[in-house]
Structure formats: structure tokens, C-alpha cells
């Protein structure tokens, strides 16, 4: 079983979502997790770390060190579910190919719409001539991340708490 599939299967059984897996130099394995209803706290990371350590031992996964973390305020958006969940929030989007000479856009995410398999994601942004709408598919997307909203009055960004 592929490492990402193994991790995803384990996390799903525990009630968590796999956001990203990174292999870093010196055998470091980073796993980013989320939970739609409650977000992630340190105890979640501990629980997942202990479970993955056991699973990796049984499955003979080669790694030196494991880090489990929340995806952070600038969470990556990779799936239609991500874009639907974070509709209404600001994101930075980079397309694989330029649209009107531009690949990078920052704007408000709109929920995916369209026929299954042909869903298009909307991004409302400020164009040269005023408000504009970019529509793209996941296959046209290079990467996307939420834009962190820092509120120093103690309010948290809704990004991880929806």
C-alpha cells in the first residue's frame, strides 16, 4: 500500500482528514491533519502521532522522525471538498497556465459548481477594470492556499474551525 494511502486510511478511521504528507531530508516525515467540525489541537496531533508510529512499525515504513501538525492558517486547498468548505474565505491561487497573462490570483473562493467530473471553482478577485470572476478546474490548478487572517483581539480565523 502506498504511504499516503496508508496514512489516509488510518486517519479516516480515527475521524481525521489528511491534508498533506511531506518527506523532508534526514528521514523526516511530516503529516498535516485536520478535522472539519472542531479543528486540530495538540492532543489530536499526539493521538495521531502515536497511532501512526504503531502502524508504521507494523507496515515497516522507513522514516527517522515523524511530525504531525495542523495545516495552519494558510491551509492548502487541493480538493473540491476543500474549496466547498472554505467558500467565502480569501485564498491565493496559482494556475498551471496563465489566463490573460496572469497565473497568480488572490480573491474570495466560491463553492465548486457544475456537472460531476466537470466542476468549476470560482474566485472573485479585483481585476484591472474592477471586480472579476476567475473560473477554473482542479486540473488547471497548480496550488492554492488560504490567506491567513490575523486578528490580534483574540478572535480566530474561521479557516480551521468550520
Curated annotation (Swiss-Prot):
Compartments where located: Cytoplasm
**One Pfam family from the UniProt entry?**
RimP_N
Q: Which InterPro entries does this UniProt record tie to the protein?
A: Ribosome_maturation_RimP, RimP_C, RimP_C_sf, RimP_N, RimP_N_sf
Q: Which domain of life is it from?
A: Bacteria
Record's keyword terms, sorted:
Cytoplasm, Ribosome biogenesis
Question: What are the GO BP annotations of this UniProt entry?
Answer: ribosomal small subunit assembly; translation
Q: Name one GO cellular component term.
A: cytosol
Q: Function, please?
A: Required for maturation of 30S ribosomal subunits.
Q: Which family does it belong to?
A: Belongs to the RimP family.
- Name this polypeptide is given: Ribosome maturation factor RimP
The organism encoding this protein is: Ralstonia nicotianae (strain ATCC BAA-1114 / GMI1000)
Amino acid at each position: 500500500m502506498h504511504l499516503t494511502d496508508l496514512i489516509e486510511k488510518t486517519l479516516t478511521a480515527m475521524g481525521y482528514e489528511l491534508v498533506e504528507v511531506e518527506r523532508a531530508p534526514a528521514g523526516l516525515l511530516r503529516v498535516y491533519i485536520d478535522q472539519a467540525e472542531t479543528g486540530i489541537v495538540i492532543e489530536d496531533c499526539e493521538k495521531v502521532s502515536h497511532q501512526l508510529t504503531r502502524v508504521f512499525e507494523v507496515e515497516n515504513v522507513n522514516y527517522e522522525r515523524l511530525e504531525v501538525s495542523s495545516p495552519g492558517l494558510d491551509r492548502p486547498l487541493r480538493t473540491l471538498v476543500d474549496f466547498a468548505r472554505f467558500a467565502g474565505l480569501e485564498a491565493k491561487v496559482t494556475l498551471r497556465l496563465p489566463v490573460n497573462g496572469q497565473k497568480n490570483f488572490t480573491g474570495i473562493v466560491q463553492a465548486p459548481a457544475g456537472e460531476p467530473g466537470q466542476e468549476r471553482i470560482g474566485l472573485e478577485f479585483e481585476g484591472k477594470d474592477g471586480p472579476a470572476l476567475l473560473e477554473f478546474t482542479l486540473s488547471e490548478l497548480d496550488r492554492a492556499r488560504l490567506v491567513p487572517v490575523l486578528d490580534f483581539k483574540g478572535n480566530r480565523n474561521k479557516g480551521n474551525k468550520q
